[in-house]
Amino acid sequence: MFKKIISFLTAIFISILGINALNNEMELLDGDFGYILDEAAQTAIIKTIYIPNNEKKDLVVPKYVSFHGNNHLVIGILENAIRSKVHRIKSFMAREDFINSARNFHSLTWLIIFNIPIISVSPAT
């Protein structure tokens, strides 16, 4: 019971981080990348992001959502995923150095809590 309460509170905390991230304008950067594989929810995961010239861009990608961006954008994407039926998310794929970075740990915590596999991919050379 205690473990479920901790898991629930952690999920709420991460959701708040994600909402804050999506409310701020974010610069898209090359480097970090990943996929949230979700055939059922499809485009429900991500709604709108901001690109550097203040133009809003809706991301519509059938069957999966891919992203390139900084840590805040990743948190926002994960927050949207947790709000759109977590049980449908099959796995999360990201670059090895992204997953191993201490600064990204809090954005991956809820994946661990919900036993969603995190797949590590070596960076392209």
Role assignments for model-derived ranges:
Residues 2-98, 106, 110-125:
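N-terminal capping/linker segments that flank leucine-rich repeat
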